[in-house]
Every structure is written in C-alpha cells, then in structure tokens.
C-alpha cells in the first residue's frame, strides 16, 4: 500500500472511530516501534500516530524505536515496561511472528493484546543500481552455481523476505541452509545496504522500495504476489517460473 493512501485510510478510520484504539481514550500515547528508523514498521507506526492525532484520539504520541531480533527485543521491552499501561501500544506484524518462531526468545505475544491489523502488502526483490545482474534469471543462475556468492539482504531472520528467499531456494533446487542471508535490524538498514551495493539482491515491502525504484537507484526484479500488482510493472516470481507467493502484514498491539 502506498504511504499516502495508508495515511488517508488511517485518518478516515480514526475520524469515524473505526480504529479499536478509540476505546483507549488516551491523551498521551506511547508507541513502541520494534525496529530501527526508516523501515516498514517505523513508517507504519508514525503514520498511525499521525492518524490518531488528526482524529483527535490522542493529544500526544511519543515513539520509541528498539530494533533487533525481528522485533523480539522491542516486544520484550514493551512487555516489561508497559504492563497494565492502557496508553502503551506497539506496532508488529508477520516479521515478528517469523522471528519468534525461529529465534525462540523468552517473551511471546501472549503477553500483549492484539488491537488491529492495519496493512497488507507484498514484497519486492531488487538489485542495486550498479549490479552486474539484470534479471531474476541471472541471479538464480549464479545462485544455483554458487549459493554462497549471492548475498540476500533483508530484515531480521524469520522475516517474510527471508522466508521468501528460502522458498525460492527450494523451488530452484538449492539447499535452503546454504543461503547467504544478511539480516538487518530493520528495513532502513536493509535499504541502505542495497543502495550501497553491499548485498547482491535485496528484499522488502514494495512501499519501502518504491521511491528508489522510481529514481533508478534500485532495479525491481520480482514481486511476491500471485498476480501483478495494480499500477506496478514488475513481474511476479510465478511469471518467471518460480512458484512462490508470500505476503506481509502489519498491525498494532
């Protein structure tokens, strides 16, 4: 979902009382964003904060970023520091679920209360602008030849782009344990690594990459949707003979 569309949608929901957060009737909200600045959770959290202010559901919203371990570090801090605090909320999503399953931290989502699912989107795989590769086929050929030579960059281990890379490996006959996956603490760090050419191929939410794709700073190879996304001329993995489809979602606890 485009960021401007998301903001308008949240503002409309807030104005009509359509967000479950209206039940809090808080004047000063504290929002935990369990990722470093610049990524999808950060964008979602700050857009939500703006919508709550615009909808007069909060007088102030303060944000705290705590990245790492697919959101588990932020979750642990949120649970420990905000127990029983009705004015504390946290952004989360599918990435956190994957991280909790793979990382097995001592904290779980059972310690928090789900409020709303806010957004859904598909991922895109991209190349740095200076990459010697041109297509997904080029990347896959090198990946099959020498899996370790292809650095896949994205969010924390267990993120949807990490899972998608493993699914791609399985589809093309590569042992998923041989994937050279470089995990970052948030989408902002992953984006910087892609722009800097520090990874071979990067993945993340399309909304996070859109401006760089449009500016020619990244080359979009494939989206992880079942069919092409409306208004976006990027082929799906399925179109390119790789039967992989996986989406991402974000919500608030």
Sequence positions of predicted segments:
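N-terminal export signals
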Residues: 5-24
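N-terminal (or domain-start) structured segment
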Residues: 24-111, 174-203
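Conserved hydrophobic residues forming the short capping helix/wall of the S-adenosyl-L-methionine
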Residues: 49-53, 169, 213
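Hinge/capping helix and adjacent helix->loop/strand transition within the periplasmic-binding protein
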Residues: 77-88, 100-189, 237, 242, ...
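Short beta-strand segments
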Residues: 91, 154, 222-223
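Solvent-exposed coil/turn segments that connect beta secondary-structure elements
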Residues: 94-96, 120, 130, 207, ...
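C-terminal lobe and pocket-closing loops
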Residues: 208-253
């Amino acid at each position: 979902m485009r960021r401007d569309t998301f903001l308008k949608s949240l503002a409309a929901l807030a104005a009509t009382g359509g967000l479950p957060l209206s039940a809090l009737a808080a004047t000063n909200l504290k929002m935990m964003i369990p990722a470093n600045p610049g990524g999808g959770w950060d964008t979602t959290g700050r857009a939500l904060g703006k919508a709550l202010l615009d909808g007069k559901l909060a007088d102030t919203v303060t944000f705290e970023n705590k990245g790492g371990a697919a959101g588990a570090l932020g979750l642990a801090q949120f649970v420990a520091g905000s127990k029983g605090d009705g004015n504390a909320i946290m952004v989360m999503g599918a990435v956190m679920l994957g991280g909790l399953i793979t990382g097995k931290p001592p904290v779980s989502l059972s310690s928090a209360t789900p409020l709303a699912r806010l957004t859904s989107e598909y991922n895109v795989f991209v190349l740095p602008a200076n990459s010697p590769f041109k297509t997904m086929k080029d990347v896959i050929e090198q990946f099959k030849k020498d899996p370790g030579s292809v650095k896949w960059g994205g969010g924390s281990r267990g993120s949807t782009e990490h899972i998608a890379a493993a699914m791609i490996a399985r589809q093309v006959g590569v042992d998923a344990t041989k994937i050279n996956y470089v995990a970052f603490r948030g989408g902002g760090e992953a984006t910087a690594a892609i722009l800097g050419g520090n990874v071979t191929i990067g993945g993340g939410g399309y909304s996070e990459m859109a401006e760089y794709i449009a500016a020619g700073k990244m080359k979009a190879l494939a989206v992880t949707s079942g069919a092409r996304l409306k208004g976006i001329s990027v082929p799906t993995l399925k179109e390119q003979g790789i039967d992989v489809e996986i989406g991402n979602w974000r919500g608030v606890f």
